[in-house]
């Protein structure tokens, strides 16, 4: 009996654990502090800084089953998903890693043992082929002489992509970053399937399938293409779980493995589909995996960056559901079956199931409102098409008006053998994309990519000032030996009391100084294991090796500490008041305010906001001790400690507890006791994305300032109403009631005046071929009264055509009324359109009543004068 996908995943991890590897949990699909990546797309992403020598772990061997998404940027598989046997937006990458420990020999031997040993995967040795980089003689000899693979099944692959190192067997994560030669292992499905070995003209067939890529990490590729040797040669391997499952379960398509068969059946059930071979089922089964896990990792549908990629995938799935005949929202119903089939890999998703389902349901409902109209428009345009390409302007209109991502439009067109002018689409979107780029958080400044080989010791928990030594200086991202007065720079010290931005808490400000210089620190950031002090040298000069006194801005740090501790209390309070589905989606803690984004599907009610405030202030009054303990990550999680969204943790973590009320993993700075916070007040609650709410709050002196401001406003209002704060509500109700009464009386007077004006106007009507025509410009009449006047005049005049106009604040308001017995010859909409066009406006309406506006008041007399001739021509 073949292994299930879940069993294969576990067997891989167990094998490498038996070889001394640390089993490391999958990292988030949102890369941590890596502006070069849209999504985690390989197992090694979370170890990138380790390969670069910027981060250190307490293990030198690791193994993971990493969740990955490839649907945007360089690694974009979206258009092929559902149409091929092996393309996915979401997949799991099984991997083993060596950080300066073993290298080529052991990496190859481990792979061969796992694949061929009867105890593990037991694949037939004669079915396995390998490739090596053309010049990698060492790997070739290991495969031939130690493993024993015949020469005819070992293939050298050179630079086959038109540039040095551009090869299927020279791996690189992106345009920059860790890279090196690799050896790939292929499985031969047999001669009953078309295809040839790698490197042959028939290599794109499905007979020989790559199942494992073993990268020998030796270089760090720079932006200019140069290769810098990594500190220690390392190993990075990747084996797609879905691919190896297909091999071990004796099927040729990933969509035929147990995991996808189960999901496809679930899709068929919720959509009502009966043909299980329909490719739309495969598309949806794939897309629920990427969408659910992206949302669980904090990505929300939007029109920018990661959120837009998520929206594209959701809408593609919804459109395929529509093709299958789904009559109601269905996509969110697949989260439960997905959790079941993912086994232990779905535990994080299960904790957020309700939140993920709600986000998917809301997004599907929003798109469903425009999907049918958009598809109808696309059908119309395709029916009119004379060539084989849909113009970019139409594709953009579908995106802008109906929310159709261009790849969804391309999907529909491809089914009819029609191409989309994507260049034209991009041109139409250029201005919007420019604005999106300006608003985007992607693309870090030059400081973000600084490489610092040294480490800094943070001593800011216990000290706000201490002496340190300059170990590195950077100007414009480049290392320098010295800086002079007036220069902006990043200063790295061997030890520092300055807190570097992390976990939502901003970096410290302060001063680095001695008798000969003063450096104003405006921000503090992490660079690998180093802490960089960002600022400007105000006076003197500074060089590497100098001793400095580092002084943190104590008052600012104190305010930050209060806000950070209050954030923890508020997080716990939100979970008590709203439910345990609340999880942190982002935060900002500075010296003025705390901002907290969290998962919740609706605006908080006033009583809920008050309950959270009261609960936090109750903990402040309890004056609970705020304690920190260092412990193993797993022990901390077992204790119930909550982890912060988007943060990466070491195996040993800092656990912050506030009595029995709050326990979280946190490396930030905090008050000593909750009583230090003094007072907590929520100043705003709003939505930031589907299923995400944001609270801003203040503490201590900031909270007291808001209390005083509220009191001052109440006093001012009481003074204006000639009352006092004790009876202010009664006073306001009285004023509002009096205002309503006066507005009612005023409206009655306006209606009486309009009726009188209508009576006066009726005598000015002229006869045109048996129909009374009345055209008039009125002064001092509100635009909204024109309709009432037209109704009155139609009742008085019988068979009639009426055009009234008024000008207010330079804007023209027009209305046309036509009695129903005349609408077969004169339509109010056409008449008003003719007049509006002459005054720089447009409008429309029913055949018997239409309204319009305009901007050219000077042209109004001539426009009204043209009505008689236009009507006469229509009535002949």
Curated annotation (Swiss-Prot):
**The enzyme's E.C. designation:** 6.1.1.7
Which cofactors is this protein said to need? Zn(2+)
Q: Which Gene3D superfamilies match?
A: 2.40.30.130, 3.10.310.40, 3.30.54.20, 6.10.250.550, Bira Bifunctional Protein, Domain 2, Threonyl-trna Synthetase, Chain A, domain 2
One cellular-component annotation, GO: cytosol
Read off the InterPro entries from this record: aa-tRNA-synth_II/BPL/LPL, Ala-tRNA-lgiase_IIc, Ala-tRNA-ligase_IIc_anticod-bd, Ala-tRNA-synth_IIc_core, Ala-tRNA-synth_IIc_N, Ala-tRNA_ligase, Ala_tRNA_ligase_euk/bac, DHHA1_dom
Q: Name one GO molecular function term.
A: ATP binding
Amino acids binding Zn(2+): 564, 568, 666, 670
Where does it primarily localize?
cytoplasm
Catalytic activity reported:
tRNA(Ala) + L-alanine + ATP = L-alanyl-tRNA(Ala) + AMP + diphosphate
Q: Which residues carry this modification: N6-acetyllysine?
A: 74
Q: Where in the cell is it found?
A: Cytoplasm
What is its biological role? Catalyzes the attachment of alanine to tRNA(Ala) in a two-step reaction: alanine is first activated by ATP to form Ala-AMP and then transferred to the acceptor end of tRNA(Ala). Also edits incorrectly charged Ser-tRNA(Ala) and Gly-tRNA(Ala) via its editing domain.
- Output the HAMAP family linked to this UniProt entry: Ala_tRNA_synth_B
PANTHER family on file: ALANINE--TRNA LIGASE, CYTOPLASMIC (PTHR11777:SF9), ALANYL-TRNA SYNTHETASE (PTHR11777)
| Family the entry assigns | Belongs to the class-II aminoacyl-tRNA synthetase family.
Q: What is this protein called?
A: Alanine--tRNA ligase
Q: Which organism is it from?
A: Shigella boydii serotype 4 (strain Sb227)
Gene that encodes it = alaS
């Amino acid at each position: 009996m073949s292994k299930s996908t879940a069993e294969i995943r576990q067997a891989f991890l167990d094998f490498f654990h038996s070889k001394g590897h640390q089993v490391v949990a999958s990292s988030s699909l949102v890369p941590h502090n890596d502006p070069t990546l849209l999504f985690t797309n390989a197992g090694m992403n979370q170890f990138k800084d380790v390969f670069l020598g910027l981060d250190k772990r307490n293990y030198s061997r690791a193994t993971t089953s990493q969740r990955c998404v490839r649907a945007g940027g360089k690694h974009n598989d979206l258009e092929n998903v559902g149409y091929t046997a092996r393309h996915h937006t979401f997949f799991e990458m099984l991997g083993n890693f060596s950080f300066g420990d073993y290298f080529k020999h052991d990496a190859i031997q481990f792979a061969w043992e796992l694949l061929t040993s009867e105890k593990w995967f037991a694949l037939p040795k004669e079915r396995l082929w390998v490739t090596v980089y053309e010049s990698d003689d060492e790997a070739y000899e290991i495969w031939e002489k130690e493993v024993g693979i015949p020469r005819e099944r070992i293939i050298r692959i050179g630079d086959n992509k038109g540039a040095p190192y551009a090869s299927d067997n020279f791996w690189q994560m992106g345009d920059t970053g860790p890279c090196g030669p690799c050896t790939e292992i292929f499985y031969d499905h047999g001669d009953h399937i078309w295809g040839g070995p790698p490197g042959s003209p028939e290599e794109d067939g499905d007979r020989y399938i790559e199942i494992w890529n073993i990268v020998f990490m030796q270089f760090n590729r720079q932006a200019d293409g140069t290769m810098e040797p990594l500190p220690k040669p390392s190993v990075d391997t990747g084996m797609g779980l879905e691919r190896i499952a297909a091999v071990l379960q004796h099927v040729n398509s990933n969509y035929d493995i147990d995991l996808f068969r189960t999901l496809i059946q679930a899709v068929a059930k919720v959509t009502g589909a009966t043909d299980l071979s329909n490719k739309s089922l495969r598309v949806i089964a794939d897309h629920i995996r990427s969408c659910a896990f992206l949302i669980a990792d904090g990505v929300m549908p939007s029109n920018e960056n990661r959120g837009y990629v998520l929206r594209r995938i959701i809408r593609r799935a919804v459109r395929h559901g529509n093709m299958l005949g789904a009559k109601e929202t269905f996509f969110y119903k697949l989260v439960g079956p997905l959790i079941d089939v993912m086994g232990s890999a779905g535990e994080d998703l299960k904790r957020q199931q309700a939140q993920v389902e709600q986000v998917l349901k809301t997004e599907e409902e929003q798109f469903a409102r425009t999907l049918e109209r958009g598809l109808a428009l696309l059908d119309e345009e395709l029916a009119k098409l004379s060539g084989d390409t849909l113009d970019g302007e139409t594709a953009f209109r579908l995106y802008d008006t109906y929310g159709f991502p261009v790849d969804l439009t391309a999907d529909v067109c491809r089914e009819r053998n029609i191409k989309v002018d994507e260049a034209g689409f991009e041109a139409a979107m250029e201005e919007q994309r420019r604005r999106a780029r300006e608003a985007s958080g992607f693309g870090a400044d030059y400081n973000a990519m600084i490489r610092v080989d040294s480490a800094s010791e943070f001593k800011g928990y216990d000290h706000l000032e201490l002496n340190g030594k300059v170990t590195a200086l950077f100007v414009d991202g480049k290392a320098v030996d010295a800086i002079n007065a007036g220069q902006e720079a990043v200063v790295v010290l061997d030890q520092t009391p300055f807190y570097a931005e992390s976990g939502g808490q901003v970096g410290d400000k302060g001063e680095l100084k001695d008798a000969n210089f003063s450096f104003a620190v405006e921000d503090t950031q992490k660079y690998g294991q180093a802490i960089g002090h960002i600022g400007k040298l105000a006076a003197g000069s500074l060089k590497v090796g100098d001793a400095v006194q580092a002084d943190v801005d104590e008052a600012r740090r104190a305010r930050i500490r209060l806000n950070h501790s209050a954030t923890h209390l508020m997080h716990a309070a939100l979970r008590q008041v709203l439910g345990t589905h609340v999880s942190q989606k982002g935060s900002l803690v500075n010296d003025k305010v705390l901002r907290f984004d969290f998962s919740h599907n609706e605006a908080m009610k006033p009583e809920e906001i008050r309950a959270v405030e009261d609960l936090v202030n109750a903990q402040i009054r309890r004056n609970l001790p705020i304690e920190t303990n260092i412990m193993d990550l797993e022990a901390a999680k077992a204790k119930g400690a909550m982890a912060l969204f988007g943060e990466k943790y070491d195996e040993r973590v800092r656990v912050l507890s506030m009595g029995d009320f709050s326990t979280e993993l946190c490396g930030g700075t905090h008050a000593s006791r909750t009583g230090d916070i003094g007072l907590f007040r929520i100043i705003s609650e709003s939505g930031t994305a589907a299923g995400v709410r944001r609270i801003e709050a203040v503490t201590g002196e900031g909270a007291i300032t808001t209390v005083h401001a509220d009191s001052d406003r109440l006093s001012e209002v009481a003074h204006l109403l000639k009352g006092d704060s004790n009876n202010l509500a009664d006073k306001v109700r009285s004023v509002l009631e009096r205002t309503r009464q006066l507005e009612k009386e005023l409206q009655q007077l306006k209606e009486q005046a309009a009726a009188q004006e209508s009576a006066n106007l009726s005598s000015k009507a002229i006869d045109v071929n048996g129909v009374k025509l009345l055209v008039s410009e009125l002064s001092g009449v509100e635009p909204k009264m024109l309709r009432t006047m037209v109704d009155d005049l139609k009742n008085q005049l019988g068979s009639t055509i009426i055009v009234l106009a008024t000008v207010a604040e330079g804007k023209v308001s027009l209305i046309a009324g036509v009695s129903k017995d005349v609408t077969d010859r004169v339509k109010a909409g056409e008449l008003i359109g003719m007049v509006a066009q002459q005054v720089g406006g447009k409008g429309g309406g029913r055949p018997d009543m239409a309204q319009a506006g305009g901007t050219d008041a000077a042209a109004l007399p001539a426009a009204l004068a043209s009505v008689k001739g236009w009507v006469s021509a229509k009535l002949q």
